[in-house]
Amino acid sequence: EYSHLFMAISGKLSAVICINDPLRKEAKYVISNLRECGIKKIVMMTGDSEKTAKSIASKVGVDEYYSEVLPEDKANFVKSEKLKGRKVIMIGDGINDSPAISESDVGIAMSEGAEIAREISDITISADNLNNLIVLKQISNKLMKRVDLSSKFIIGFNLGLILLGVGGFVRPSTSAFLHNASTVGISLNSMTNLLENTNTYNYH
């Protein structure tokens, strides 16, 4: 589970430095909930060793993992997934993640990460709380649902007004009033909160 740095002096191994980057306690919970929100495939790509990557992947429950990858490898992976017709979200915080973030459909960077990653990303979130990823997906799902329902209502309502007008059941002035009233109603509904609560999460 450790990344190893080897130090040599005069061509001879003098020390091995073991580095452990603790796993975020909410990581497994976040990945599980992203699946519940509709994310079908979650992949981890890291420059760490195979042993370290395998250990982390098994703990958090990703679908696939790739170890010892270079920045161009990450970018090429994103390109290949897009060629398969998939929408790709890339999350990263380092310079090495920047090419892949740039190639993705939606790039998400950590606010405490490299400046270049933040500049080219579409969204920046705080690294203090990975639960923000769940909130983003929930907002996306709710927004798309609201847009879909609003569009269907507007089309259906206006079509009904047209048919009633053609049939002579509704006067033009009444039809115009109802049309404007429905527009105001849809606008007011669009201003309501998409999520009731985004602050409470239970993970172990």
Task: Describe the role of every protein-language-model region.
Residues 1-96, 102-106, 138-141, 200-204:
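Cytosolic catalytic headpiece
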Residues 38-39, 60, 64, 96-97, ...:
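Membrane-embedded alpha-helical bundles of multi-pass transporters
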Residues 109:
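ABC-family ATPase nucleotide-binding domain "signature/switch" substructure
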